[in-house]
Structures are given as structure tokens and as C-alpha cells.
Amino acid sequence: MDPKEVLKRLTEGVSLSQEEAKELADLIMEGSIPEPLVAGILVALKMKGETPDEIIGFVNSMRQHALKLDLRNTLDTAGTGGDGIGTINVSTATALAVSSVFPVAKHGNRAASSRSGSADFLESLGYNIQVPPEKAKDLLSRNNFVFLFAQLYHPSMKNVAPVRKVLGVRTIFNLLGPLTNPAGSERQVMGVYSLPFMRKLAEAALKLGYVKLVLVHGEPGLDEVSPQGKTYITEVTGSKVEEYTYDFSEIIGQPVPVSRLTTTDPLDSVRRVLMASMGRDEAVEKFIRINVSVALYTAGLVSDFKDGFELSEELVRKLPDRIETLVRDNGDPSKIKAIKGSL
């Protein structure tokens, strides 16, 4: 494959096959293409519009180059990020809450465009995010939760990171993170920053082995379930795709403005989540609970979002103790104790 020829084709609007996309991604992952050419290819893909086959090809390459695990009977809540709104770490809080009743392998990274990434949030709690493959399975079996740090499990991404940083725009790699959990989680809630990508990601997911994937995009532009307006939902169940909208104000009553859910940094996000779990921040509590309701539905533990919302109250109330248990087994519990003591 000649990368220059690929760039020429992409600029002419010609899409790649799944096999071609994987071969191209392999070359990028291996550092075999000069950075200026990689930048051109990523921008050309973006301008043309990434197809499901191109996404699948890149996903398969990333999975092949990742450190390997087999923890398929798990749930993940990793999303695309990049909505630019800066809400509290609701997907990570959701993962922690749901892990009380279903095994969770949370895939995540440090903040790129947000104020607090999942890795930053967990570190602020005292959780050790550097969990190698040889320890991940035992940690999951003991605690029903493990965090898989993207920088550790996708070492080949170091060949792409400088280009992505210089470009400063979303590329195909923003879509790949949530689809490349090294655990191979068969169930996932995936927040998507852009509504047009929902269908593309769903079509790609049909060929990626999910038992249940629920993609969500909430008004006004959230890559999460929205407490303010409608949430656009695409369910992938085996070979079936279903699209619909849901207004969670039917469950929570008065809508919650997104402006009440923003955070300034990881520690602030941690404090807001803990306050919510203690019943002292109603807006954040509702935000977490509706996201937990969708995760419980995705895990197959409830039949609808309303039942999930009812169960979520108990799980959210248990969060402080749940977090302390997880951190005590893998991290520095003095951090979470100090934060709890300051609230």
C-alpha cells in the first residue's frame, strides 16, 4: 500500500474498503508513515466522512496492536468525549455505581478536550489506574470493577499522539477509543458527541461482536444521557438496530439545565459526585441516576429505563463506600477518606 496514493484517493472522495483501512491503520500504528502524511490522511478521511467499513478497519487494527485481555462478560461506559461542555465525570460515576451489581471493565484515558478524563477522576479518588493485564482479571474477579488505562493498553497510539495534538481537530481516532476496549466488553453504553455519527458507529458495531450496545446523544449536544432535553438513542442488539428518542424528564420530573452539571477539574468532579451520592446535589444526582438507568438496561438487569432509575437510587447512595472499597484494594484510600472528610 502506498500511503501517498491513499491520500490522493481520499481527497478525491473515494472511500477505503475495510481491508484497506486496516492495512492503512497498521502502517500508522507501526510508525511507518511520516507524520505530515498521517496528518493529511486523517484530515482527508474527516473531510470525506469516515464510513462504517473504514471505522471497522481502524478498530480491528487498534485491537490487534493492543495489549490483550479476555473479559468479555463485562460492561463498559466509555464514550467518544469531545462534546466541549465539561460536565462532571458521569460515565465513570455510572461505571462505579453499576459495578455493585454487574462486572465493569472501564476503558478510559486522561482528559483531551474535557476538564476531567476518567483516568484523572479515578486518580483523584486514589485509584491506581496503572493496572497491567496480568492483574486486571484478578482485580475484576475480586471487585467486579477494573479500569483499563488507554495509554497503557494501546502503546502503538504513541505513534499517532503527536499528530493528533498538532492537528487539534477531531479525527477518526476520536471514534475508535470507545470501540477498542482491550477487555472486549460485550455490553456498552457509548456517549457520542455528534448525532450524525450515531448511525455510522451502529453500523460498525454490527460487525464488532457486541451483545448489546446503546449509543446515546443528549440535548443540547451531550455525549451522555441528557437531563435537560431529549436523548437520541440507538440500540444495537446482535444483528438488530433500533433508533428512538427518550425524554428523561418523564422519570426525573423537572428538567435539569446542563449548566448545573459542569465541573472545573477532576477534584471538583469527585466532590460533586460524592455530594450527589449523599443527597446534597440534586442536579448531579439526577444526572448520574438517569445514566445509571441506561447502563442497567444495557447490562440486561432491568427491562426499561424507569425500572433502572428506581434501582439507581440505592446504587448511587452506596457510591462513597463502594469507591472506598475499590480504592482500598487498588490504590491509596487516604485520598478518598480525606475528600469525604472535607465534605
Curated annotation (Swiss-Prot):
Organism whose genome encodes this protein = Metallosphaera sedula (strain ATCC 51363 / DSM 5348 / JCM 9185 / NBRC 15509 / TH2)
Q: Which gene encodes it?
A: trpD
The superkingdom listed in its UniProt entry is Archaea
EC number in record: 2.4.2.18
**Does the keyword DNA repair belong to this entry?**
no
Taking the record's annotation, the residue ranges forming a coiled coil are: none
User: For binding Mg(2+) 2, which residues are annotated in this chain's numbering?
Assistant: D223, E224
- Which of this chain's residues are annotated to bind Mg(2+) 1? S91, E224
Where do the annotations place anthranilate 2 binding?
Answer: R164
Q: What is the lineage of its organism?
A: Archaea, Thermoproteota, Thermoprotei, Sulfolobales, Sulfolobaceae
The protein's name: Anthranilate phosphoribosyltransferase
